Amino acid sequence: MTNIRKTHPLMKIINHSFIDLPTPSNISAWWNFGSLLGACLGIQIITGLFLAMHYTSDTATAFSSVTHICRDVNYGWLIRYMHANGASMFFICLFLHVGRGVYYGSYSYTETWNIGIILLFTVMATAFMGYVLPWGQMSFWGATVITNLLSAIPYIGTTLVEWIWGGFSVDKATLTRFFAFHFILPFIIAALVMVHLLFLHETGSNNPSGLNSDSDKIPFHPYFTIKDFLGLLLLISILMSLVLFSPDLLGDPDNYTPANPLSTPPHIKPEWYFLFAYAILRSIPNKLGGVLALVFSILILAILPLLQFSKQRSMMFRPLSQCLFWILTADLLTLTWIGGQPVEHPFIIIGQLASILYFSIILILFPMFSLLENKLLKW
């Protein structure tokens, strides 16, 4: 008798995706982040559901309802901080996952890559709206500043901003709709993840060498299920250490002050995972130019397949491109640091130079170095 997992319509899908999936035998720990992102999404949806049971999306009570969750709900503090720090873990895994894709040339799978970029934008939108919900000072002013950027769009800008706000400023209507969107988007993300995996399983996984691995595939279970489980243990260990020892390490103290439209905080800044894009936005003096630079700082990932001039897919055997990749990583860390600093000398010029370097590396230096490496290898 054939095994039920190979015949039952539902079990068959699970079997082909997680059990009998042919996987390259040489994929490293950098390939763990997909499953870790799935785990993060699961944690966020579960903790978020329990938070939503006690949260009220009204400007008068939102801040107090979060305080109530932390003080009066059983393990409410744990759920709240797991959700807040879970978002940070989510973005750490996302950045490493995207970085892996760039390093090993996984962007050659264009459908998977483009769905991934849509996922990145959706997760960023969800995180931004989630940050507004506690209705602290940084929530209110962050929402005001970021939504206001849309007013830079010619002709329809102002109307668009007021339409999003549901009035003439960030208020009750804005908070209510942000809560509604923040609740629904993770389920849309889950659906997009299915599409992401669907396209990935059409081609099979890439591997560190960037070569075709059809001749050396092994079943996903038990080899990679056990490997993913180790990654999951590490993820949960780091997350719980953060939650239980220093839950406010990555947060902003200003968000413990209830939102006050009459008092502007000295430094308005988003959560740490948006700081690199925020630094790029601030480094351009023109409003529309800044908004375009902000969008293109992530959308630039979509043109990576067009900038691939190397005869080798992966950077594993390309020392010049490797060097450039790590300079880009350092540059992104610099931008993250600058995004959290006040707008004054020398931070302004450092931010501008780091922004120029970011776009130059991706648009000019990567293609140049690829061609140079081809020449050095007489290809």
Swiss-Prot record:
The keyword Oxidoreductase does not apply. Keywords: Electron transport, Heme, Iron, Membrane, Metal-binding, Mitochondrion, Mitochondrion inner membrane, Respiratory chain, Transmembrane, Transmembrane helix, Transport, Ubiquinone. Its cofactor is heme b. The chain crosses the membrane at residues 33-53, 77-98, 113-133, 178-198, 226-246, 288-308, 320-340, 347-367. CDD domains: cytochrome_b_C (cd00290), Cytochrome_b_N (cd00284). GO terms for biological process: mitochondrial electron transport, ubiquinol to cytochrome c. GO terms for molecular function: metal ion binding; ubiquinol-cytochrome-c reductase activity. A ubiquinone binds at residue 201. GO terms for cellular component: mitochondrial inner membrane; respiratory chain complex III. The cytochrome bc1 complex contains 11 subunits: 3 respiratory subunits (MT-CYB, CYC1 and UQCRFS1), 2 core proteins (UQCRC1 and UQCRC2) and 6 low-molecular weight proteins (UQCRH/QCR6, UQCRB/QCR7, UQCRQ/QCR8, UQCR10/QCR9, UQCR11/QCR10 and a cleavage product of UQCRFS1). This cytochrome bc1 complex then forms a dimer. Heme 1 (or BL or b562) is low-potential and absorbs at about 562 nm, and heme 2 (or BH or b566) is high-potential and absorbs at about 566 nm. This is Cytochrome b. It comes from Dryomys nitedula.
